[in-house]
């Protein structure tokens, strides 16, 4: 039962990213020509080095104290076998993370001082190009965090494939291969089995709209919901 619940959680995480993508531009963005955060990743004696979705080379020497800037990212990190010392407020309200972590602000307006005060080993952020409702883009925190000697990685996650790529990188960092199998490859196999049931079936035209406090947005085929349809 625990295994089933975990796999359902992994699927739910990928679905929730679609909603997050409609609120923050960076989550629904492309990989900027990067074939994946795990590509170019190398294991080194001094830590684990990989290239994030914005093309930055990141080395994580230890991962005992990690901060996640989005609830969905906090969830992915825990699914990869990691624990957190800090996370955005939605990690607690929407994802109910298990880690005993501190809040570091809303995902659209993270507090750099709160993050640095936690003395993190590694910070996971979204590669957003702008904030929401006048908020601060998470990419704007890069210089402050790096000046404090804190490794920071940016991920662009919208579809399940994006989730799978990020999960693989996180599992490589934590060294938990079993977590990737349980929450990654086995979930992918379940999705493929469902897709095969729909092969040969006719499909109509669908318009998907997301309404939030800032207005209404049409979901494109590149979003998680569009990909599912």
Language-model segments: residues:
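Sec-dependent bacterial lipoprotein signal peptides
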Residues: 1-25
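Alpha-helical, coiled-coil/dimerization segments enriched in small aliphatic residues
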Residues: 89-93, 217-229
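Extracytoplasmic/secreted envelope proteins and their assembly/folding machinery
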Residues: 60-64, 70-78, 112, 116, ...
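Extracytoplasmic substrate-binding proteins
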Residues: 47, 56-57, 140-215
